[in-house]
Amino acid sequence: MRIQVNARNRGYDFDALPGERVLYAGLRAGIDLPYECATGTCGTCKAKLVSGRVRDRWPGAPGRKYVKPQAGEFLMCQGEAEEALTLEVSSFVYPLEPGACVPQSCSGTMRNVRALTHDVTAFALDLERPRDFDAGQFVLLAPEGIDGYRAYSMCNYARGGRSLDFVVKRKAGGAFSEWLFGANRDGARLDAFGPLGKATFEPGLGKNLLCIAGGSGLAGMMSILARAEAANYFERHQGWVFFGVRTMKDAFFLQELSHVSAEVTVALSEEDVPRGTQWSKLRFERGLVHEVAKRAMAGKYQNVRAYVAGPPPAVDAAIRVLLLDAKLTTDNIRYDKFS
């Protein structure tokens, strides 16, 4: 199906496969259409329908509160073309940068499914063919029988790798997490689309790294840290990691974090700091993760790039600290927040 998108700066033409969402078709064609979550929760990918017919794959998407259906607006991540379309988006749109990892559809097999805590599960997804991705990116996942994708960041880093590592936190009423926690999913098949996301790191950055993560938002940070460690990045630059959880029983990847060359602090929001732990290389503080980071980072923000991930309230609170207290410019704050 032919789709024409008219942006503020120019127009683009691309084809969508049968059943393919407009956003995914455009990204697959190498066009950097506007998006954030790519799953219907944020509203960033809204467009105005000029001509043609669109099927709404998720009429109840939270992101629909940001669109005006009566004005022809819809979410490209949930819109499926039923005939040739002409659309308008209000932002400037450019082709993906040369060398960027172009999102594609693929599928894979789950293996090594294991519990990290009472409500966090980890697994690897073995892909049918190798895929490139940048440290800090995410993909969209969907098992058979569940409509729609869910966004999850990779924990590992490997260009041309055939395995992606994930952590998933159980969410009451969440279709994917209930499916995952409901049975042994070793050997299950997942459809995937990606990689996506701009909260990425590469060793040529030349800045000190600050990572602030709440809960399973740590996943993308682990990918960034793996990339940095492989390049011996912390021999030349400083690094700080702040990992927020409610209690010690909610913490995971502590062994992996204890081997990171950056300074790592675990923030406990609902429990006092334990008197002694087996993790002698890690620091533990009481408080919300953005508050702990604010106290520890005072006066240390020179030449810093910050990465933030986690539940939307935690991400918003951390961004306020980085803008108002740290005085970081917006180009030095990279974040992902998934609802």
Label each residue range with its predicted role.
Residues 1-79, 84-85, 239-339:
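Reductase modules of NAD(P)H-dependent flavoproteins
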Residues 50-53, 90-92, 144, 195:
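Short, surface-exposed secondary-structure boundary micro-motifs
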Residues 64, 71-123:
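Fe-S ferredoxin-like electron-transfer domains
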Residues 98-188, 207, 245-247, 268-272:
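Ferredoxin-reductase
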Residues 136, 217, 311:
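Short, conserved phosphate/pyrophosphate- and ester-handling motifs at nucleotide-, phospho-/glycolipid
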Residues 194-206:
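A short, basic/flexible loop-to-alpha-helix module at the beginning of a structural domain
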Residues 200, 209-227, 234:
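Phosphate-binding glycine-rich loops and their immediate beta-loop-alpha structural context
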